[in-house]
Amino acid sequence: MREVISINVGQAGCQIGNACWELYSLEHGIKPDGHLEDGLSKPKGGEEGFSTFFHETGYGKFVPRAIYVDLEPNVIDEVRNGPYKDLFHPEQLISGKEDAANNYARGHYTVGREILGDVLDRIRKLADQCDGLQGFLFTHSLGGGTGSGLGSLLLEELSAEYGKKSKLEFAVYPAPQVSTSVVEPYNTVLTTHTTLEHADCTFMVDNEAIYDMCKRNLDIPRPSFANLNNLIAQVVSSVTASLRFDGSLNVDLNEFQTNLVPYPRIHFPLVSYSPVLSKSKAFHESNSVSEITNACFEPGNQMVKCDPRDGKYMATCLLYRGDVVTRDVQRAVEQVKNKKTVQLVDWCPTGFKIGICYEPPTATPNSQLATVDRAVCMLSNTTSIAEAWKRIDRKFDLMYAKRAFVHWYVGEGMEEGEFTEAREDLAALERDYIEVGADSYAEEEEF
């Protein structure tokens, strides 16, 4: 067995977790109470597959290997009283009494630290149920207080306790359209600095990019968080499908790092997903393999706002789902390689890693997304994602030049030096991206 424990931290993490577990349950044929759908003798996905994410109890009930953590009770109370309340073990839902007030320092040093012991105990219990734990899957936001502060604190602790296990993150990057607080740039820079050496691979999800996709592709005039989360859940499901169903590529978490991370700090692959279609448009689209593959290289299908045509690709994984034939995939990849718009770094072989999972994508009943025969999720490590860091660093600098809001952080026991240290680390990260994008033959000429 190669089990994965999911950890959802903060409001965004917990709400994305809800959307994901609803989707996983549908995909594996598990009802909201944790029992199998009528007519099924075992969950879909094969014995090996589903048990990476679900644990079977002695009573034939399936319980997610997941933990929800938030410093204020509202979001987790919705899970406790919602349609999936019987799916989760009550001890897996951990909430505090007062929130982090959008303050990284409260989540990391004061309020978050009080709840840390309980969370780690619960993670140990889940880990004890596993025969061969392969790692952890985090979902949290970078801009909130709990997601950034407690999220990074947990990652640090897990690094110390489970050093060799993989730690993958789905991190929500802040955006002006759905911004909830003015200090998001501070929280983002501080948490990125703290987790840079602890996370093995971080898939960033930019709220602005998802917001635009919902408006453009799903015809939702003013997308809500629920709309955004349904789309994010589809992406998370596609990335984890090869772990949960029998697939040929990225069958375990280590493989993501091996395929996508050329240097430990450059671990932020860009995620693209296609097709994103509303139910009304689905019947008018053919969605051939070459169409959905080409769409992944278009900026409009990316989860982070940046232009890959300005950067270079270091590594690419294409994860297909559904009715897909290898020959069509090879042809589609050849077409992409022949295009002049896709630039690859010259020090890396031009291989595109391909994975095919024959289980087609599913859409939840209340989602705006259409159910399609095939879909593709592309994970690509490209230098253009550095644009996202540039944007947030610029916002950080504008506020920090005036030392705006800094007293709230210092008041929670944080030292002001941490701000400059974190900012310098992100400046170094921006430089790292420039260096890996530079042509190696240009460097050789300098010597």
Swiss-Prot record:
Protein's job: Tubulin is the major constituent of microtubules, a cylinder consisting of laterally associated linear protofilaments composed of alpha- and beta-tubulin heterodimers. Microtubules grow by the addition of GTP-tubulin dimers to the microtubule end, where a stabilizing cap forms. Below the cap, tubulin dimers are in GDP-bound state, owing to GTPase activity of alpha-tubulin.
Record's miscellaneous remark: Present with 5590 molecules/cell in log phase SD medium.
SMART domains listed in its UniProt record: Tubulin, Tubulin_C
Keyword Magnesium found: yes
Lineage of the species this protein comes from: Eukaryota, Fungi, Dikarya, Ascomycota, Saccharomycotina
Molecular function GO labels: GTP binding; hydrolase activity; metal ion binding; structural constituent of cytoskeleton
Cofactor(s) required, per the database record: Mg(2+)
Binding-site list for GTP: Q11, E72, S141, G145, T146, T180, N207, N229
Reactions mediated catalytically: GTP + H2O = GDP + phosphate + H(+)
Catalytic residues, chain numbering: E255
Any matching Pfam family: Tubulin_C
Cytoplasm keyword on record: yes
Record GO cellular component, one term: microtubule
InterPro entries: Alpha_tubulin, Tub_FtsZ_C, Tubulin, Tubulin/FtsZ-like_C, Tubulin/FtsZ_2-layer-sand-dom, Tubulin/FtsZ_GTPase_sf, Tubulin_C, Tubulin_CS
Ligand binding (Mg(2+)): E72
Family that this chain belongs to: Belongs to the tubulin family.
Summary of subunit composition and partner proteins: Dimer of alpha and beta chains. A typical microtubule is a hollow water-filled tube with an outer diameter of 25 nm and an inner diameter of 15 nM. Alpha-beta heterodimers associate head-to-tail to form protofilaments running lengthwise along the microtubule wall with the beta-tubulin subunit facing the microtubule plus end conferring a structural polarity. Microtubules usually have 13 protofilaments but different protofilament numbers can be found in some organisms and specialized cells.
Name of protein: Tubulin alpha-1 chain
Organism superkingdom: Eukaryota
Protein's GO biological process: homologous chromosome segregation; microtubule cytoskeleton organization; mitotic cell cycle; mitotic sister chromatid segregation; nuclear division; nuclear migration along microtubule; nuclear migration by microtubule mediated pushing forces
